[in-house]
């Protein structure tokens, strides 16, 4: 796991955008795994800026989102399809027919939808770079604590903590879903590269458990310890409970030298 600590959240977004841009510019048909929530919004803004500046094109890119609320219409402003359209897809040249979410409408079988989503990812050649955030309880996607480390795309019941964390996004009289479709932990680990972004003091405990805690389903993000190419981008607040800050800074300086000479990716 490569841990990189930045002074602030904006620097996290800028570095994450460099990872995405290099992949898109290096690979003819890149496949991105995308996330929602507050953390990646600044990343998407950086990518939109790069597109408008002529630094990259999404025309050959395929994307798969981590999750989507169960039974919510894609046109609903609380849907993750709406989120992605508003924050990225509407502002770049990506073909929306090649942007996928694990949508499961009312009356559809969530188990069949999960299998179908896994098939679509496989048919696209797998995910090259999966973007992640992390919940305060260590969840990635909607893989809540005690999720199986071997799990695949499926329906999940959201914990009360996740519901509380997300309640600020819903009006008091607005329906808030308690179920969601999500890529599984094994699905995430299948990505060739994983890039997790975490900012703010509220994520510090989960970050510590992910990076230095035991591998455990209690902290789903700790599964990234098993990934060959996991990159963790943190601001100082999110990294505040990690020990050995000096080591992470020193290691990053060594990696910067290698990346400058050979690029961020070793197999593209």
Curated annotation (Swiss-Prot):
The active site is at 67 (proton acceptor), 137 (for ring-opening step), 139 (proton acceptor), 144 (for ring-opening step). Keywords: Carbohydrate metabolism, Hydrolase. One of its GO terms (molecular function) is identical protein binding. The keyword Hydrolase applies. The keyword Hydrolase applies. Gene3D superfamilies: 3.40.50.1360. It comes from the Bacteria. It catalyses: alpha-D-glucosamine 6-phosphate + H2O = beta-D-fructose 6-phosphate + NH4(+). One of its GO terms (cellular component) is cytoplasm. GO terms for biological process: carbohydrate metabolic process; glucosamine catabolic process; N-acetylglucosamine catabolic process; N-acetylneuraminate catabolic process. Its EC number is 3.5.99.6. Pfam families: Glucosamine_iso. Pathway: Amino-sugar metabolism; N-acetylneuraminate degradation; D-fructose 6-phosphate from N-acetylneuraminate: step 5/5. Signal peptide: none annotated. CDD domains: GlcN6P_deaminase. Catalyzes the reversible isomerization-deamination of glucosamine 6-phosphate (GlcN6P) to form fructose 6-phosphate (Fru6P) and ammonium ion. Belongs to the glucosamine/galactosamine-6-phosphate isomerase family. NagB subfamily. Homohexamer. This is Glucosamine-6-phosphate deaminase. It comes from Colwellia psychrerythraea (strain 34H / ATCC BAA-681) (Vibrio psychroerythus). The lineage of its organism: Bacteria, Pseudomonadati, Pseudomonadota, Gammaproteobacteria, Alteromonadales. The gene is nagB.
